[in-house]
Amino acid sequence: SSSSSSSSWGDSQGTASVSGSNPGLATQQTQAMSSLDFEDYLRAIAQKTFEDAKLSTAQAPLRSQSLTAAQIAQVMRAFTFEDTRIAFAIFAHDRCVDPGNYYKTYDALEFELSIEEIEEAIGQ
């Protein structure tokens, strides 16, 4: 019964606040994005032509929603360039519901050095 499924992933859960300090953020991060919303989210990223547009599209909903490590890896595969994959992996780490499984994102990378760069940035 989702009448607006085409853009529901981009909604900010009814909150009008767009400031960086969202008190509801911590509670929203305990549950990952639903698989239906995730499909819409991946489709929206894939529709973008340019890498920077893909990255900003990927980052936008994560201001109020979270992903699993496996979902983050899927998003990383949507990018053409390794640098973008690294940037997204670093950005998404704080929005991961299962950070203990973050190693799963490393399969989406081409180079061993990329893993080191991410681990250094996220403090592992």
Locate the predicted segments by residue.
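General marker for long, soluble alpha-helical cores
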Residues: 1-124
